[in-house]
Regions:
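Short helices/loops that flank or line small-molecule/ion binding pockets
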Residues: 76-85, 98-109
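Proline- and acidic/polar-enriched loop/turn elements at helix boundaries
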Residues: 45-47, 94, 116
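A short secondary-structure junction motif
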Residues: 37-41, 119, 131
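Solvent-exposed loop/turn segments at secondary-structure junctions
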Residues: 63-67, 96-98, 116-121, 169-170
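Paired acidic/hydrophobic, glycine-rich loop segments that form the ligand-binding mouth/hinge
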Residues: 110-114
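Extracytoplasmic/peripheral linker and loop segments enriched in polar/acidic and small residues
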Residues: 23, 84-100, 125-170
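Extracellular/periplasmic catalytic domains that process cell-envelope and extracellular macromolecules
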Residues: 50-53, 104-107, 143
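Append "and occasionally in soluble cytosolic enzymes with long acidic Gly/Pro-rich linkers
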Residues: 1-80, 167
Length: 170
């Protein structure tokens, strides 16, 4: 539900926490991020969205209308977790994948999931660089990320690239 740090950058997990405690910590961190974005939080629930915000969104996934997708379980768990804090994430399971790409290209989809094969080379340009082919789909325009992606492309040393790409993904 949330990153491993809260909105202030503090670690939310400690050694010895149970899975239930970690889950609760993640939900609390998520509420902190929502509150920082202008949402109203009352008694551990989202109760109002800021101007221009909403308490619901639709996550679109091309899972054949039957949940047949590698990300479907994670998306379902996220939807349930968000619902528990007052945010409704509706899952739109498409049977026709072309509807996903049409929606992405027209900018009418709130959130989406897709899956594809990876290449043996961990090059991140196509997906994460502002000028990469998929960047418009992710709406990622971060100069720092672009620099790390380009830095990783300058070496054939796999350990070096792994460290640079880990930093980029963090």
């Amino acid at each position: 539900v949330a990153f491993s740090t809260d909105v202030d950058g503090n670690e939310i997990y400690t050694d010895g926490m149970t899975e239930d405690e970690k889950y609760a910590a993640a939900l609390d961190a998520a509420l902190g991020y929502f509150e920082a974005a202008g949402y109203t939080v009352t008694d551990g629930k989202l109760t109002a969205a800021p101007e221009g915000g909403r308490l619901e969104c639709t996550a679109t996934i091309p899972a054949g209308g039957s949940g047949d997708h590698p990300s479907f379980g994670i998306l379902t768990a996220a939807s349930e977790a968000l619902k528990s804090i007052g945010f409704d994430m509706v899952i739109n399971d498409l049977s026709d994948t072309s509807q996903l790409w049409d929606g992405i290209n027209s900018g009418t989809i709130d959130m989406w999931c897709a899956a594809w094969s990876a290449t043996p080379d961990p090059d991140m340009f196509q997906i994460y660089h502002s000028e990469g082919g998929s960047a418009k789909n992710y709406r990622i325009y971060q100069p720092e990320l672009d620099e790390l992606v380009m830095e990783g492309r300058t070496s054939t040393d796999q350990e070096y690239r792994k460290a640079v790409y880990k930093e980029a993904l963090d």
